[in-house]
Amino acid sequence: MEFTFPNYYKEFSCIAGSCPDTCCAGWKIVIDNKTLKKYQHFKGPFHNRLHNDIDWKEHVFRQYNRRCAFLNEENLCDIYTEAGPKMLCDTCRNYPRHIEEFEGLREISLSLSCPEAARILLSQKEKVHSRMNTSDTSKDLFKNMWKTIVPEMEVLRPGWKEFLKERLDSLYISSGENDYIYQKSEFDFYCPDWQIQEEQLLVYWIYTYFCGAVYDDEIFTKVKMAVVCTLFIHELDVGTYLKNEHHFNLNDQIQICYQFSRELEHSDLNLNKFQELMSENNIFSFENLLKIC
């Protein structure tokens, strides 16, 4: 499978209540069957609201004064705030991301009908160009990277593999590539501190190991190690965010970072094996790293 997307695609994140307009007004959104069943079986105080404000015959959200029944006065979605992001229907979860699928090809774009997407598109200073990923999706690449590394590492502390499994299962199991991309975008939006932490972590790995290349000439290996370690921590962050029902704080981040660091850096065997895999295993090629960055 090949998939293409414009170079500015990853710049988008929903600005929610700060948006000058709302995508939930004047648009009769059709609810997909899977989500409709979730609404039918939803338990809790919000059940009556779902039952009353959905047109079950037409499979759409009711509208009042051309506004979705679940759009509150702050232009935020009550389904999201009361029931959680997992209860959003496919259209609400994906918009303004637009996907067209053909045989062997998936085209992903941002809809011009979204003010923030329009701003990003029209603010580009260079001609637009498309990026293409081939074969493995980013989710598949990450899964294969974990499967390559984890069995090769000695476990220093009891519970480490269980710690990984709980978080990675939350991220990878029962989610397609579109859900995976959305979940990571959602985390980045609701946890903006990650952008600063990402830079701090990348600098840490570079600062700690890059100059060691004067002894073994493995410059690219050190760089790849820094990138992969930072990306792995991000995957664990998103998995923790999902495991904790869309909650994540600094203590979560601290726990992930120090436990990951201990398992890797407190063992010469693990450090050497990690760098050996960066150097010799094709799954960590620069081509693959560019696909997931």
Name each model-derived stretch.
Residues 11-18, 127, 201-206:
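Short, compositionally biased low-complexity segments
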Residues 80-84, 102, 217-225:
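Conserved aromatic-histidine-acidic binding/catalytic patches
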Residues 134-293:
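Hydrophobic, aromatic-lined core segments that form the binding pocket/scaffold
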Residues 83-134:
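Internal, well-ordered alpha/beta segment that forms a basic, Gly-enriched binding/recognition surface
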Residues 17, 27, 71, 80, ...:
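Structured loops at beta-to-helix junctions and adjacent beta-edge loops in soluble globular domains
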Residues 20, 25, 29-30, 74, ...:
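Secreted/processed peptides and extracellular or luminal domains of membrane proteins
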Residues 27-65:
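N-terminal, Lys/Arg-enriched amphipathic/low-complexity engagement segments
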Residues 1-19, 51-89, 106-109:
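Immediate flanking context of iron-sulfur cluster ligation sites
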